[in-house]
Amino acid sequence: SIYKRPEDGIVLVDQGRCRGYQECVRGCPYKKVFFNPMTSTSEKCIACFPKVETGLQPQCFANCIGKIRMAGFINTPENARADNPLDYLVHIKKIALPLYPQFGLEPNVYYIPPIHVPTSFTRQMFGPGVDAAVKTYREMASANDMDLMGLLGLFGSTDRMMTKWKR
């Protein structure tokens, strides 16, 4: 009833299979599916997949006032490319982490953990790699890490998905 598209990892609700019993709402570990009483269906964000299919970022990414979201495609760790922005943040610098890795769902959304939140909370949300991620993020200026600072500066700079960047 809830499925992940293999081509881009977007998770959708199959309206033909997920009826008005609200089991899809209860089944979502991230609590992102809601029941719409007007249509008697379970619904969730569709990640603007029609835009993604044309190479554009989802609307919430493009309109993010904090410019903290970047959409794109990520490779497996063994195929990570340093010129792919998301590979660089997730696999090379390891500052972008999945939310609730203990669920074992292999999410396609990664976050740079907040630095002004209690460590006990961020460890619960992001797992054991969070301490190193926060340390790398905090020290990037003093370490003069121009690649990382430059890449983070690209967040929100375009409405298109970035698949490559030149260091």
What is the predicted function of each stretch?
Residues 43-46:
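Membrane-embedded catalytic interface detector for glycan/lipid assembly enzymes
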Residues 66-167:
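Long, compositionally biased charged/polar accessory segments in the mid-to-C-terminal portions
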Residues 1-17, 23-40, 56-80, 97, ...:
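Iron-sulfur cluster-binding cysteine motifs and their immediate structural context
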